[in-house]
Curated annotation (Swiss-Prot):
This is Argininosuccinate lyase. It comes from the Bacteria. The gene is argH. GO terms for molecular function: argininosuccinate lyase activity. Belongs to the lyase 1 family. Argininosuccinate lyase subfamily. It is an enzyme of class 4 (lyase). It is found in: Cytoplasm. It comes from Pseudomonas aeruginosa (strain LESB58). It catalyses: 2-(N(omega)-L-arginino)succinate = fumarate + L-arginine.
Length: 464
């Protein structure tokens, strides 16, 4: 053990000061100081409530609030001296408050524990983060709607198993991402409801003997409700886990989107081009233009998934109530919020700037017998059972593979080898336009349905 010693603010019960290494090892101020604004907000509300119930005088309340506001100004000016020996954001601020206003500063913590204090701080912080993230989701969705509307008639191949399946419009494809992000938005809105419950007043674990009125601090801090059990109030980290789960789903969606953008920008696809400002080059290969933004977002999804797993593992073995283990909740939570926010911001900036290569997309849609299902549906309308039609078209596709011809490139006589039900009108359904226009229903790829979906999407966003 190291011989350097340091004193803590709770040292009254101890016969020797804590070891200096242990002090550094157990301190959290290096990362939890980002909670300072919310810590001060909670303390101001707590002091206001204590004055209302007569625990503090009005003069003491005013001195505390003024001191806290001055401390916030110091922190934001970069002149605050963060001390590791004071462990965390809470004790750093309280110690500085006492330096500023004297013994009155020591009264702030009356009826409160760091256990309910930190739980309150995290909820206040996460509530703000969710609001910021929701705004970025909306901004990305707006970009998708604009691009989808512009590309409502642009035809590209749709894929299953990464093999050409059926023609779709680029606008329709983009709207799939709009839908996924909409679910992400809803999950985070729902998560926010459970974040916005106030633990302050739970004290260490059993509540407090002081005549506090939790409804006052609840209203001052903008919480929806007061937590109903003090043990749960200081122990609960469900809200953080739930946020990381919702964030993981959102990052999974962005990762899938990223994978498509990486594929589409490759020389093998060439479906889209990204502006140079969203790409980087190679230190050795002069020709390279690398889609680093989507690649990095794809990679960053893993750290968010890891944070979720880490928080679940952190909580699974803890008895009630608070344990020091919970200090480990903040870094994965902070990192998850930062990563999701930055990834959404990058995509919200980048997506409206995507430049589709329409002719290349269209040519790709012509290949791979993408209208085979349309031919089968055509034969169904002629009165044949679908399974028979499926087999007939399968034979036609095999012939096309052997002869190097797409279905639309075959002559009527060639097509009639497989079914005498085929007439000259078949070529209307074998065109790319005929294929996408035929899927004219809600959720379909027809251009007019894409435009209708864009209109519905804009109405949805306007109601947020």
């Amino acid at each position: 053990m190291s011989v350097e010693k340091t004193n803590q603010s709770w040292g009254g019960r101890f016969s020797e000061p804590v070891d200096a290494f242990v002090a550094r090892f157990t301190a959290s101020v290096d990362f939890d100081k980002r909670l300072y604004r919310h810590d001060i907000m909670g303390s101001i509300a707590h002091a206001t409530m204590l004055a209302k119930v007569g625990v503090l005088s009005d003069a003491e309340r005013d001195a505390i609030i003024d001191g806290l506001q001055q401390i916030q100004a110091e922190i934001e000016a970069g002149s605050f001296d963060w001390r590791v020996d004071l462990e965390d954001v809470h004790m750093n601020i309280e110690a500085r408050l006492t330096d500023r206003i004297g013994v009155t500063g020591k009264k702030l913590h009356t009826g409160r524990s760091r256990n309910d204090q930190v739980a309150t701080d995290i909820r206040l912080w996460l509530r703000d983060e969710i609001d910021t993230i929701l705004a970025e989701i909306t901004r990305l969705q707006e970009g998708l709607l604009g691009l989808a509307e512009a590309e409502a008639d642009t035809i590209m191949p749709g894929f299953t198993h990464l093999q050409t399946a059926q023609p779709v419009t680029f606008g329709h494809h983009l709207l799939a991402w709009f839908e996924m992000l909409g679910r992400d938005y809803e999950r985070l809105v729902d998560c926010r409801k459970r974040v916005n419950r106030m633990p302050l007043g739970s004290a260490a674990l059993a509540g407090t003997t002081y005549p506090i009125q939790r409804e006052i601090t609840c209203q001052l801090l903008g919480f929806d409700a007061v937590g109903g059990n003090s043990l749960d109030g200081v122990s609960d980290r469900d809200f953080a886990i739930e946020f990381c789960a919702a964030a993981s789903l959102a990052m999974m969606h962005l990762s899938r989107f990223s994978e498509e953008l990486v594929l589409w920008t490759s020389a093998q696809f060439q479906f889209i081009d990204l502006p140079d400002r969203f790409c980087t080059g190679s230190s050795i290969m002069p020709q390279k233009k690398n889609p680093d933004v989507p690649e990095l977002v794809r990679g960053k999804s893993g750290r968010v998934f890891g944070a979720l797993t880490g928080l679940l593992t952190l909580m699974k073995g803890q008895p009630l109530a608070y344990n020091k283990d919970n200090q480990e909740d903040k870094e994965p939570l902070f990192d998850t919020a930062d990563t999701l926010h930055d990834s959404l911001r990058a995509f919200a900036d980048m997506v409206p700037a995507i430049r589709p290569r329409r002719e290349i997309m269209r040519e790709a849609a012509r290949r791979g017998f993408s209208t085979a299902t349309d031919l089968a549906d055509y034969l169904v309308r002629k009165g044949l059972p679908f399974r028979d039609c499926h087999e007939i078209v399968g034979h036609a596709v095999k012939y096309g593979v052997d002869s190097g011809k797409d279905l639309a490139e075959m002559s009527l006589d060639e097509l009639r080898r497989f079914s005498e039900q085929i007439d000259a009108d078949v070529f209307d359904v074998l065109t790319l336009e005929g294929s996408v226009n035929a899927r004219d229903h809600i959720g379909g790829t027809a251009p007019n349905q894409v435009r209708a979906a864009v209109a519905r999407g804009r109405k949805l966003l306007a109601q947020r």
